[in-house]
Amino acid sequence: MTPTHPTVTELLLPLSEIDDRGVYFEDSFTSWRDHIRHGAAIAAALRERLDPARPPHVGVLLQNTPFFSATLVAGALSGIVPVGLNPVRRGAALAGDIAKADCQLVLTGSGSAEVPADVEHINVDSPEWTDEVAAHRDTEVRFRSADLADLFMLIFTSGTSGDPKAVKCSHRKVAIAGVTITQRFSLGRDDVCYVSMPLFHSNAVLVGWAVAAACQGSMALRRKFSASQFLADVRRYGATYANYVGKPLSYVLATPELPDDADNPLRAVYGNEGVPGDIDRFGRRFGCVVMDGFGSTEGGVAITRTLDTPAGALGPLPGGIQIVDPDTGEPCPTGVVGELVNTAGPGGFEGYYNDEAAEAERMAGGVYHSGDLAYRDDAGYAYFAGRLGDWMRVDGENLGTAPIERVLMRYPDATEVAVYPVPDPVVGDQVMAALVLAPGTKFDADKFRAFLTEQPDLGHKQWPSYVRVSAGLPRTMTFKVIKRQLSAEGVACADPVWPIRR
């Protein structure tokens, strides 16, 4: 460890003596000292339940609550590994994620998605669990000696195959993100970090929660992002820094503009996948600096915008990052779309848990393959051009198409299904599905919507926004669906298209 390369445990150490700063949540405030103590009690209670012969992995299926944050503290203190579980996943899909990550049990709350019946889980809002943790309230707070390479957390994301992968996030990866953002914006003890992005996502953990710990200021947690309450929360908690991923800037900008919007304490906002025009508009309207970066949970390719980066560009390509032809691996000429790769190695990618095949594919030939498409201009600035493979970016979440297709194939009138992205009018993608119906049947949008509602393993973000009904799907000679053609034709195709109301 060095002053600029601490572990997460070392970030938390000074917080254990702080009483005048801490965690804000709704109408409550908990000092850092008490929050760290709560984490120690949770760790002790969990240790009594965990089998020491198995990986100490604990699934977390919670909204942004102090308990979620305290569970991250518990992990840093004890070596227990929190596993962020995405509530978009349901039923057998969620059970598969839990099994893939070797979770011994899952922490849920009153607002959590339903956990499969055969999975051991704890309702952290229950009186029984509250008493169980309270029994350890006098547990001595001990800061274990962690190594930078030690596993801190597993965070699920979707890969090119559509199947979720558990990304390994070490102490180094999480802590250095917090330190970097703290230094970039000169954050300190007087700052309040507003975290409304979901803590099961890497964005909230790395550039939200870890930033609050690194700057030794305070953190304000929002259970679930709300555009209408964003400015009210900033003023209520005195928030000076906030993070985002995807559309939140656009959602906030869509709220009615008032003359005093810039009268607020917010001074810095950091995130990724913001709409270029909205980044500037947000900064002007609310009187703050907005910096939009490019990266992923894996962390193999990261691009930082500079002050002279053109509008719409990701930033200049760093050393070792190239845009190559996905088929040949040769560098692409200026203006030609190719895959972003890291030729220097894995970068910040630390591997997938329990998925050697996916990890080998990601690092084929010793090169990190991001699965993201881009092109560069004459000055060397990169521009995002979509995603290679079978996945979509919807409302800040990576969604695989295969799990959605498996659900839609249950629709009784469908004989063939293809799911693919179409551009969202604001940012990212919308889900579109092409169906081939059984002979003698007609598409009924109300019937289809009722079917979607009844599917226990289909989250709302996975619902198709549009359904195309076709006589047949375009296929290759090896019978694979040509999804790039479907995506290119979009909603303006020759076939009938129905919008599906969520």
Swiss-Prot record:
Catalytic reaction equation(s): a medium-chain fatty acid + ATP + CoA = a medium-chain fatty acyl-CoA + AMP + diphosphate; a long-chain fatty acid + ATP + CoA = a long-chain fatty acyl-CoA + AMP + diphosphate; hexanoate + ATP + CoA = hexanoyl-CoA + AMP + diphosphate; dodecanoate + ATP + CoA = dodecanoyl-CoA + AMP + diphosphate
Gene Ontology CC annotations of this record: cytosol; plasma membrane
Pathway annotation from the record: Lipid metabolism; fatty acid biosynthesis
Domain of life: Bacteria
UniProt xrefs under Gene3D superfamilies: 3.30.300.30, N-terminal domain of ligase-like (3.40.50.12780)
Gene Ontology terms: biological process: Actinobacterium-type cell wall biogenesis; lipid biosynthetic process; long-chain fatty acid biosynthetic process; long-chain fatty acid import into cell; long-chain fatty acid metabolic process
PROSITE patterns reported for this sequence: AMP_BINDING (PS00455)
Record key words, sorted: ATP-binding, Fatty acid metabolism, Ligase, Lipid metabolism, Nucleotide-binding
Listed Pfam families: AMP-binding, AMP-binding_C
Entry's family note: Belongs to the ATP-dependent AMP-binding enzyme family.
Official protein name in the record: Medium/long-chain-fatty-acid--CoA ligase FadD17
Origin species: Mycobacterium tuberculosis (strain ATCC 25618 / H37Rv)
Name of the gene encoding the protein in the UniProt record: fadD17
